[in-house]
Amino acid sequence: MHLLPEQATRHAVSIPELLVSRDERQARQHAWLTRHLTPLVSFTVVAPGPIKDSELTRRIFNHGVTALLAVAKKAGWSVREQAALASASGPEGFLAIEAPARDLKLATIELEHQHPLGRLWDIDVLTPEGDILSRRHFSLPARRCLLCEQSAAECARGKTHALSDLLIRMEALLHDADSSHIN
C-alpha cells in the first residue's frame, strides 16, 4: 500500500484542483463505506504550500501506512481492504478496518501523539454511517502549529510562518523517524 517517492508529481496544485480532489476523496469514502459497512480510516499528509505530492509527503505517508497497519495488527483488528493513491491533494490512504469506530479513533489519536511523524498525518475515522469522529468528540484541543504553540489553523490562515521553515521542520521530523527506525 506504499507509494513510490520517486514517482511524486511535484505538481503545484491550484485551489480549484484542491477542491475537486477533496470532493473526489469524499466520494471515494462514501463508496468504501457502502462496500464495507465497517469503519474507514481515511489518511492524508499535512502538506503546507502548493506542492502536495512530493518525495517528502510520500515518505511521510509511507511511515503512516506502516504505523496504521501495526496498530490494527496489535489490536487484533482485521483490515478488510486497503489502498493508496496519489491525488492532486497529495497521498491518500484508505483502510476498512473491523473495529469499533470509537476505539479506532482513540488509537489513531494516540498514534498522532506518540509517533515522531504523527503531527504530519491527518487521520480521519469515519463510522459505518459516514460520520467523521473528530478530536472534539474526545474533548481534545485543536492541533498545534509545527513551529509554535499557536493553533495550526490560525497559523495557516494567517500565513504566520515561511513555507521554507515548515518544510525544513517536516524534513527534520522525517529524519528523526528514519534515524530511530520507527515505522
From Swiss-Prot:
Source domain of life: Bacteria
GO biological process: prosthetic group biosynthetic process
Entry keywords, A to Z: Nucleotidyltransferase, Transferase
Reactions performed catalytically: apo-[citrate lyase ACP] + 2'-(5''-triphospho-alpha-D-ribosyl)-3'-dephospho-CoA = holo-[citrate lyase ACP] + diphosphate
Keyword Nucleotidyltransferase: yes
Top-level enzyme category: transferase
Signal peptide: none
Family affiliation: Belongs to the CitX family.
Main function: Transfers 2-(5''-triphosphoribosyl)-3'-dephosphocoenzyme-A on a serine residue to the apo-acyl carrier protein (gamma chain) of the citrate lyase to yield holo-acyl carrier protein.
Name of the featured protein: Apo-citrate lyase phosphoribosyl-dephospho-CoA transferase
